[in-house]
Amino acid sequence: SLKNVIRKELDSIKKEFGSQRKTIVEDAKEAVYVAAPIKEETVYFVMDRFGYSKTMDKATYQRNKENILKEYKFIVPCMNTDKICIFTNLGVMHQIKVLDIPAGKFRDKGVPIDNLCNYDSTKEYIIQVLDAESMIHSSLLFATAKSMLKVMDGELLNAAKRTVQATKLSEDELIEVIPVDWTEESEDKVVLQ
């Protein structure tokens, strides 16, 4: 029958071209791959007035501190495992993992912040940049163009999403976000200019 003919042909092909199995099939435990832990270190997130950003290690920052303070609009010390929080005039907070921001030397140009998060420089502009770790342990004072003030616990903005509405604005514009450490007894004053 046709079935036997096919079997004989397959057996002859197996004998002619067959080889021994190179791997062992066994009932073993599941393979677990452990990624090497990231060494935590202090880095500096810097962004110039054109929105080009990068991180640099502490030694590079210390060597070029004077020039960095002149050339960069935002300078944020943070851990390399932390997140950077960018507040815009629309009341939106964008988050970027520090590990996603390319590290560079002092003279390197950096990467546009538009390419790293959902920030769009054609519709909004940056008013404050903070590191997430210090932000969640302090209160934030929001000030708008119409002189409205709001104090909010930074822990409320600790979210997994990359873009969060930090505060609602009704036909207004956020002009400042200030981290503050107020207590019930403190009598700190805020002066808007």
Model-derived features with residue positions:
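C-terminal interaction appendages of subunits in large macromolecular complexes
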Residues: 1-193
